[in-house]
Amino acid sequence: YFGKLCKERGISVTFLLGARTASDLLELDEFRKYGETFVTTEDGSMGEKGYVTNHSILSKYHFNQISTCGPKPMMVSVAKYAQANNIRCEASLENLMACGLGACLCCVEKTSKGNLCVCTEGPVFDVNKLLW
């Protein structure tokens, strides 16, 4: 959805996808429809071997914005990269959401504004406001 929306609005998007192995990558052709797509796998079975935060593309391009989603440890690394390079970065959090109303407090995330419910006040947050 993100890529499609950006393309419809004339916004250029570069995707950097990461996974443990090539078989874990999903919808690669879908990403390629909407922007230049680079891949990294931990085992080197597709694209560059390693993590998204170590991909060579990061030294070749200047990015004005990063949007990240996935496992929290990876998003923390991406956020640190963005902060070190003064790049605006948003993370789409995937916390467990039980009620979807904020009543159960199951999805609470610590932020500079206090504890916020991901289901009602997210799921997208500026990484500079997240207290990881």
What do these predicted regions represent?
Residues 1-91:
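FNR/FR-type flavoprotein reductase catalytic core
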Residues 1, 72-73, 94-123:
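Local cysteine-cluster metal-coordination motifs and their immediate loop/turn environment
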